[in-house]
Amino acid sequence: MTAGSRYVKIIEWSDADNCFIGSCPELFYGGCHGSNEREVFDELCEIIDEMVELYKKDGKPLPSPISGKELVNELQKVA
């Protein structure tokens, strides 16, 4: 398991953009997009790992991952 594995990964279809959008709420929004859901997920995982490395390189603390009830509460704020 990598440090990036702890973060939520969201892949959703965008009618406006006519493609899948991948994001990681704790680190960034709208990180990648494409027509193949699996490829977007794989790219999102790579971007998350790169972001984690950038945080470490810059000496910044990583944001806390959202999990369990926290995730549900955060998603309800958006809905």
Describe each model-derived feature in a short phrase.
Residues 2-5, 20, 28:
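ATP-dependent carboxylate activation and anion-phosphoryl transfer catalytic cores
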Residues 12-26:
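Short aromatic-glycine-(Arg/Gly/Cys) micro-motifs in beta-strand/loop hairpins
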